[in-house]
Amino acid sequence: MQEILVLGAGKIGALITGLLADSGDYRVQLADKEEGAADDVVKAHGHGNLDAFMFDASDAASLTAHIRANNPVAVISGLPYYCNVAVAKVVREENLHYFDLTEDVAVTEEVRKLAEGAKTVFVPQCGLAPGFISIAANELIQHFDELKSVKLRVGALPQHPNNVLKYSLTWSTDGVINEYGNLCQSIVDGTEVDVLPLEGLEQIEIDGKLYEAFNTSGGLGSLGNTYGERVTTMNYKTIRYPGHCEQIRLLMNGLKLNHDRSTLKRILENAVPQTLQDVVIIYAAVTGFQDGELREENYVNKVYPELVSDRLWSAIQITTAAGICSVMDLVLSNPSNYSGFIAQEEFGLIDILENRFGEYYAHGGTNLTSAEAVARGATGHQR
């Protein structure tokens, strides 16, 4: 049984911990800096393969001391993006495998530099977007002789929106603000460029329902680096219900809260409720030439909340945790096949979907799951 250190007992870390422990192949060390946070998750899971610890993982000395005392083979960071470089530095020094969920471009570049020459693996951006969307798009790309455009679209939305933003906080508020406020990598006319967030507003119709999509930061991952010389257009946009972008523009641009993110975070967390009743929409479209003909292929999927260990977990929790667990599982099953920096697109879509963790993407659940769970009181407390 391999020892895994999971940093952060929040929304995603709690499910990562449960999935890995339930597999029977991993013993999980869950750490959080807040008193009782890791203990509460471990008690809620009630699993013998879990241990709780309290320390500040952003402090190099504390993290190093824990690693040397408890000997994990890999570290999963479920911490806010701004903590990950410090964690990755310690992991590099201790010769462990590293996985994170960051969407931040600058953090990923720092991790890439740290991974140079490493015999262990460094795999950032292991969540949904970036993460699974890159894997799905890469599979489509392989079907074409010549590429023209690659469009990545992902959204985590409340199933039943009833506020002016038509949105609920389903994951990290810091992460949402970061995506909405930072420059966005794109390829336009064959050239890598940075475009403004909250721009490029478009309508998109999926299963007969109308959504909007607009530029946000980080979701392109490393696909631009991998295929930049082969594609004319490549971009990533976040999917929301119509009208959301206009409201966020008012907050971030009109009221200048992009320059006062702590205030924006406080406003959002005081006004926008959390929910476990969400839906994740994944949409990738690739256009190019096959056998001399211009064609398009799509990957479209909706993932709903699911019951894990008799408790309801949101779709964004399911997709994010399944993404990083499946990638780590593939690496640790064949560690000799990997070393250094590993981009998400180096993993095969079918390998992810057939993995015991990645299979959550394959069946996706239904929109009835959360309704039934609420009706019989199975939503529960996750920690």
What is each stretch, according to the model?
Residues D56, P72-V85, N95, L101-A106:
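N-terminal glycine-rich "phosphate-gripper" loop used for MgATP/nucleotide binding
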Residues H143-R383:
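C-terminal catalytic/substrate-binding lobe primarily of soluble NAD(P)-dependent oxidoreductases
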Residues L101-P124:
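Rossmann-fold NAD(P)-binding glycine/threonine-rich loop
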Residues I12:
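Hydrophobic/small residue at the entry helix of a nucleotide-binding pocket
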Residues I4-G8:
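Conserved N-terminal Rossmann-fold NAD(P)-binding element of oxidoreductases
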Residues E34-A37:
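Helix N-cap at the beta1-alpha1 junction of Rossmann-like dinucleotide-binding domains, i.e.
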Residues A57-N70:
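Conserved Rossmann-fold cofactor-binding substructure of NAD(P)-dependent oxidoreductases
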Residues H45-D59:
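Rossmann-fold cofactor-recognition segment
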